[in-house]
């Protein structure tokens, strides 16, 4: 599980969770150089979720000359970065790939208005676009962005000199060029350096720090470095190498997030291990030697002197004096899985959450205080072991993953409460999960399910993060530069509830928008006219606007989509018009009303930045060619003015706009030529704002959703600057919004957990969900909230209306007898070492946790009892003094009933899977052949342990099959355990024993196969659904029907018609009744009356497989002694075996023999064997078990599930590498 959207997630396997404000280091290859921007922390802790653009701490300072006169005496307001969401596996998604386009230079002094051919257009011809390939990241815990060298032949700017361009108009009578005032500075002597890290703190400061370095990719280390400092907003720089030590080679620059005057520099570990500390914004430094090598730093979010350091040898150190002294906290810390406490949630400010690995390879979640982290003072909030790299601490939530028996379970703690298991829809069966966001007391998660390969489903949770419901299926995903997952989902900033998503529909990718957090989605309406003013003929749903939603991996470009909290409703994105998303014929589009309507502003790819609270837009062409112009718009992209910002064309490698929304400064990085020094161009926009804004310069804007004024349960009216008003806002300006609640309507509610939407608004229970079953925490005498199938969307502010109708109703807890009792070990193994702790977990599907007594007998003469489940939630530990085989028995009892569960524990060369083959129904007093198929086949000797019913002593064989006779009618349990070396696995099945029965094979409409995950629970639930459908149509008694769904594809089943439970002496009459029931069922099936709805829009029809109905099978002497019947049986068996061997690939139900399924966990019902499909046919008549797993199968095995070769979906076991 991961938090997506960062390069170093601090969450689930494969992608650590990002944290606020840290150093960025990203590579954007143009000519081999790179630049890195330092924000508020260390290189491994960036935050830039895939669901929204990165909102980062201030980049550029505001110069005093940029202030209006009346503002000079006012205090400087710090720009606070907004809270970020993380997309994590929980996995972590990151920004998208970078592309550039080549295009010719536009005529100077041009002003372009959409509707007239733009300067870059030549009639209808389009220039060839050349993709700019993204480069690899320098390190996995930071971003790197290249500063490219320019083309050869250009005159390099004089080293160390300063170029100044003032705001002027130049040119002859026919042309006139607008100029912006700018200054350029060359970093002298660093032309060989290929990396740079830039920090601009803002906060009433004019200081800029730049660390340039030469990174040798062959050696994997930094060989040269230079530190530059500016005190005049980047107009000039001073080289500080003599102040840090001429021989000191620096590798990283860190800035304290709570006090940006405090700077920390790390030396390259290949040279020395030291840290340089400054408390005056880099003017002076103190150097401290270290006894360990730092890999990453994590600053405390509140205390400016508290720092955590992670070393190269996986040890965690702490400092409480900003790196002057260090103390070892713990060893064997999982990389990136350590977190500071969260204010308001953790009791101690110096508490640290960490994931610690033990010597035996397990991981545990521990917490301790930085100065008190001895073994006696540590605590374990989750007592059991967890999966490695699965701890995520994010806002109010803590996530972990635990894998037992090959299937991962996810747990969440909300506001530091006890951990609860995350509830996804029963058959989502995730093989990968990413946490997208934890904003607004709700979790957004992207889940890749068992039948998905390049798409994810979006799920949203309740406030506690436990119950998840489906918001959108098949969202497109891709891989980033470091192999990280990119989920194409984007949250529009400034207005809550609006998301954009790229969904894969029939191999086409289309862009959808929602205004209510995923309850309803619709396609984007294309613009009415194009850039030339010609009508656009694009009709929904066949044609629409599609957008690229990946955020840029280059922090110095605006990215392909951008929106700001400070400019609500304004969205700029790259995309195309058509039937699907295109990567070639693209342009830039803008929406001024939160995505309702769109206009095209460029027909090529541009970077667009927001200035002065969104009142002005700045655009620069995204191209590898040198440029000296940029475009400015004051009317939300309706018209554009072109300005020159440098005298010589510059190969632009990136640009920084100060994070403060009222800024008028931009810094452009680049080179004038291939071998020139690095150029830093400071561009001042102050001159283009003619005056200060007045009341007459503002207008109101109503947020609508296709004309509906109520969005997320309220009407919102924003005040914004009128398009075209060329005025500047003051620093005291704060965007105003008026809102009032709406009456609750259908669209303010989503389906609750366990319910699915049918039609526009009706929520009905899913086939696997029982809405009448209360929580296990519901104790007799208490009350609980019984869902109506609906829940109000989190953060929706509607009132009255349908709120009472859809709200959950309070009901008394009915009290339930224990059911579904299970006893398992914490690691899922059935082997324990003598003298070591064996920890048991008792699980119960239904019952009253508070009023149920529990007894656990360890099988060695020791037993324990508990009055309720509370003391045993973290497991029951026991140490076995001697080796052997022990039957562990769990017994649960309350005043309504009891339940028992068994586990056979061995203290004993690994086998991976055993499949127990037994008939579903057997005849009393007749031998039943039972066999076990082991995968992979073992060359050595295997020992088989067989338990029948409640027997405490197993039958032990060296053969994989056994014959057994059941003496009494009823349901019997059969368990087999296979021991190979020190490994032990088991399978359990149930068999129904009767005097006689009849059976019939069933098949289904083909659409069921696509939705068949081929796991035991699904087969059991589908069997129950078929049984209910048969009873509904025929009114046959429930206890006389048994439906068993077979493993494998195509999906098939067997219908058993059983005698009544209370069999009397009138046997012949009952046999006649059985024949009548068979005829009734057969007629209903042949008339296609038996069908069920699997999910909305998926109707499944049940058919009779066209084979002869099996005759009555019983245990009477008359039947077994009939010579004629025996002769007919022999003939029929021979014919059947021949036909099966000859045509088994063509008979649908033969798959139940040919496909030995390696199920994801133990079967819940018995699987097919010799007697359920044709009378008197035994397993020996079919292929040997070894052949079942070998050449005769026309199947492929992916993960551990066999599927038909023609199947289009790939089935995999959910992997345990990312939660």
Swiss-Prot record:
Record's bilayer topology term: Single-pass type I membrane protein
Region named Interaction with DLG4: 1216-1219
Gene Ontology terms describing biological process: learning; memory; postsynaptic modulation of chemical synaptic transmission; regulation of long-term synaptic depression
Stretches for region Disordered: 71-181
Parts of the chain on the Cytoplasmic side: 1144-1219
Residues annotated as glycosylated: 204, 453, 786, 797, 837, 929, 950
Propeptide: 34-130
Annotated signal peptide: 1-33
UniProt keyword list: Cell membrane, Glycoprotein, Membrane, Repeat, Signal, Synapse, Transmembrane, Transmembrane helix
Transmembrane feature ranges: 1123-1143
Null allele phenotype: Mice show impairments in synaptic plasticity, particularly with a loss of long-term synaptic depression in the hippocampus while maintaining normal long-term potentiation. Pronounced deficits in spatial learning and memory, and accelerated extinction of fear memories seen. Significant reduction in basal synaptic transmission, particularly in the CA1 region of the hippocampus, with more pronounced effects observed in young adult mice compared to juveniles. Altered short-term plasticity, marked by increased facilitation and reduced synaptic depression during repetitive stimuli.
Job description of the protein: Plays an important role in modulating synaptic transmission and plasticity in the hippocampus, probably by affecting the trafficking and localization of AMPA-type glutamate receptors in the postsynaptic density.
Family: Belongs to the VPS10-related sortilin family. SORCS subfamily.
Protein name: VPS10 domain-containing receptor SorCS3
């Amino acid at each position: 599980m991961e938090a997506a959207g960062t390069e170093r997630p601090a969450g689930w396997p494969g992608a650590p969770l990002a944290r606020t404000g840290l150093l960025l280091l990203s590579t954007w290859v143009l000519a081999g150089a790179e630049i890195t921007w330092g924000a508020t922390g260390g290189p491994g802790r960036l935050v830039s979720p895939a669901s929204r653009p990165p909102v980062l701490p201030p980049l550029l300072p505001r110069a005093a000359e940029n202030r209006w006169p009346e503002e000079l005496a006012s205090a400087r307001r710090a720009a606070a970065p907004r809270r970020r969401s993380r997309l994590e596996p929980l996995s972590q998604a990151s920004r998208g790939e970078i592309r550039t386009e080549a295009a010719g230079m536009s005529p100077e002094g041009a002003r372009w208005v959409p509707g007239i051919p733009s300067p870059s257009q030549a009639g209808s011809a389009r220039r060839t676009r050349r993709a700019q390939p993204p480069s690899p990241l320098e390190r996995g815990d930071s971003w790197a962005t290249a500063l490219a060298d320019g083309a050869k032949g250009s005159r390099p700017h004089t080293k160390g000199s300063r170029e100044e361009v003032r705001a002027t108009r130049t040119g002859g009578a026919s042309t006139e060029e607008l100029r912006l005032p700018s200054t350029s500075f060359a970093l002298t002597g660093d032309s060989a350096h290929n990396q740079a890290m830039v920090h601009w703190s803002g906060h009433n400061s004019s200081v800029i720090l730049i660390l340039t370095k030469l990174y040798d990719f062959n050696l994997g280390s930094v060989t040269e470095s230079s530190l530059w400092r500016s005190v005049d907003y980047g107009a000039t720089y001073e080289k500080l190498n003599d102040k840090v030590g001429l021989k000191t080679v620096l590798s990283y620059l860190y800035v304290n997030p709570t006090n940006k005057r405090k700077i920390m520099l790390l030396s390259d570990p290949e040279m020395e291990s030291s840290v340089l500390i400054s408390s005056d914004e880099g003017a002076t430094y103190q150097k401290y030697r270290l006894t360990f090598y730092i890999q990453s730093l994590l600053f405390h979010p509140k205390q400016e002197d508290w720092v955590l350091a992670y070393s190269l040898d996986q040890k965690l150190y702490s400092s409480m004096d900003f790196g002057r002294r260090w103390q070892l906290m713990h060893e064997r810390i999982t990389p990136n899985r350590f977190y500071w406490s969260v204010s308001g949630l953790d009791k101690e400010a110096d508490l640290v959450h960490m994931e610690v690995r033990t010597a035996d390879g397990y991981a545990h979640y521990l917490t301790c205080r930085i100065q008190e982290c001895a073994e006696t003072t540590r605590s374990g909030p989750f007592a059991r072991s967890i999966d490695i790299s699965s701890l995520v601490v994010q806002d109010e939530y803590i996530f972990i993953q635990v894998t037992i028996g090959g299937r991962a379970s996810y747990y969440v703690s909300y506001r530091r409460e006890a951990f609860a298991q995350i509830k996804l829809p029963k058959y989502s069966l995730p093989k990968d999960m990413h946490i997208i966001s934890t904003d607004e007391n709700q979790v957004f998660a992207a889940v890749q399910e068992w039948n998905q390969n390049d798409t994810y489903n979006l799920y949203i949770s309740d406030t506690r993060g436990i119950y998840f419901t489906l918001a959108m299926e098949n969202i497109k995903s891709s891989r980033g530069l470091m192999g990280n997952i990119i989920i194409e989902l984007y949250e529009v900033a400034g207005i809550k509830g609006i998301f954009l998503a790229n969904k894969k529909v029939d191999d086409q990718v289309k862009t959808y928008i929602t205004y209510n957090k995923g309850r309803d989605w619709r396609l984007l309406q294309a613009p009415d006219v194009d850039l030339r003013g010609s009508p656009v003929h694009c009709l929904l749903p066949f044609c629409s606007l599609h957008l690229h939603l990946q955020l840029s991996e280059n922090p110095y470009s605006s990215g392909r989509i951008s929106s700001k909290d400070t400019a609500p409703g304004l969205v700029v994105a790259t995309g195309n018009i058509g039937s699907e998303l295109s990567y070639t014929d693209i342009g830039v589009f803008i929406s001024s009303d939160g995505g309702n309507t769109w206009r095209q502003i460029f027909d090529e790819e541009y970077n667009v930045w927001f200035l002065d609270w969104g009142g002005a837009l700045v655009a620069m062409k995204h191209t590898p060619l040198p440029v000296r112009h940029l475009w400015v718009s004051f009317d939300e992209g309706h018209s554009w003015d072109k300005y020159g910002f440098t005298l010589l064309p510059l190969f632009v490698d990136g640009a920084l706009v100060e994070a403060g929304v009222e800024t008028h400064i931009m810094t452009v990085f680049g080179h004038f030529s291939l071998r020139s020094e690095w150029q830093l161009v400071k561009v001042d926009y102050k001159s283009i704002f003619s005056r200060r804004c007045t009341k007459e310069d503002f207008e109101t804007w109503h947020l609508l959703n296709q004309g509906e004024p109520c969005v997320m349960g309220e009407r919102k009216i924003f005040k914004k600057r009128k398009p075209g008003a060329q005025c500047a806002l003051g620093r005291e300006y704060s965007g105003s919004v008026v809102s009032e609640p709406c009456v609750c309507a259908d669209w303010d509610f989503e389906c609750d957990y366990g319910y699915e939407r049918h039609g526009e608004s009706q929520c009905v229970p899913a086939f696997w969900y029982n809405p009448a079953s209360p929580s296990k925490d519901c104790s007799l005498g208490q009350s609980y909230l019984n869902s109506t199938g609906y829940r109000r969307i989190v953060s929706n502010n509607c009132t009255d209306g349908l709120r009472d109708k859809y709200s959950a109703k309070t009901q008394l807890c009915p009290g339930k007898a224990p059911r579904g009792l299970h006893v398992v070990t914490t690691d899922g193994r059935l082997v324990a070492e003598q003298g070591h702790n064996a920890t048991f977990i008792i699980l119960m599907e239904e019952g009253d946790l508070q009023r149920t007594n529990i007894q656990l007998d360890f099988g060695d003469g020791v037993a324990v009892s508990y009055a309720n489940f509370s003391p045993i939630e973290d497991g029951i530990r026991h140490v076995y003094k001697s080796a052997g085989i022990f039957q562990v028995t769990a017994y649960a009892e309350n005043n309504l009933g009891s339940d028992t569960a068994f586990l056979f524990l061995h203290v004993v060369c690994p086998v991976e899977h055993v499949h127990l083959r037994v008939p579903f129904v057997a005849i009393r007093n007749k031998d039943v052949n039972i066999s076990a198929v082991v995968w992979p086949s073992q060359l050595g000797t295997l020992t088989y342990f067989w338990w029948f019913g409640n027997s405490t002593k197993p039958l032990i064989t060296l053969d994989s099959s056994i014959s057994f006779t059941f003496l009494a009618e009823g349901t019997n349990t059969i368990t087999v355990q296979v021991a190979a070396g020190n490994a032990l696995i088991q399978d359990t099945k149930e068999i129904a024993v009767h005097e006689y029965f009849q059976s019939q094979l069933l098949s289904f409409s083909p659409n069921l196969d696509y939705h068949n995950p081929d796991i035991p629970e699904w087969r059991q639930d589908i069997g129950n659904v078929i049984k209910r459908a048969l009873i509904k149509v025929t009114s046959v008694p429930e206890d006389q029907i048994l439906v068993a769904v077979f493993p494998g594809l195509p999906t098939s089943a067997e219908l058993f018609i059983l005698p009544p439970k209370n069999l009397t002496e009138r046997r012949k009459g009952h046999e006649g009744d059985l024949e009548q029931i068979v005829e009734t069922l057969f007629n209903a099936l042949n008339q296609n009356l038996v069908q069920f709805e699997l999910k909305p829009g998926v109707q499944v029809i049940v058919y009779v497989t066209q084979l002869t109905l099996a005759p009555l099978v019983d245990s009477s002497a008359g039947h077994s002694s009939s010579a004629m019947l025996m002769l007919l049986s022999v003939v029929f068996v021979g014919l059947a075996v021949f036909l099966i061997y000859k045509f088994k690939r063509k008979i649908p139900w033969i798959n139940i023999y040919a496909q030995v399924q390696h199920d994801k966990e133990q079967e819940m019902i018995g699987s097919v064997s010799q007697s359920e499909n044709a009378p008197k046919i035994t397993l020996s008549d079919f292929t040997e078990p070894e052949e079942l797993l070998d050449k005769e199968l026309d199947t492929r095995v992916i993960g551990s599930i066999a599927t038909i070769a023609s199947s289009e979906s790939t089935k995999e076991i959910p992997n345990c590498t990312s939660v």
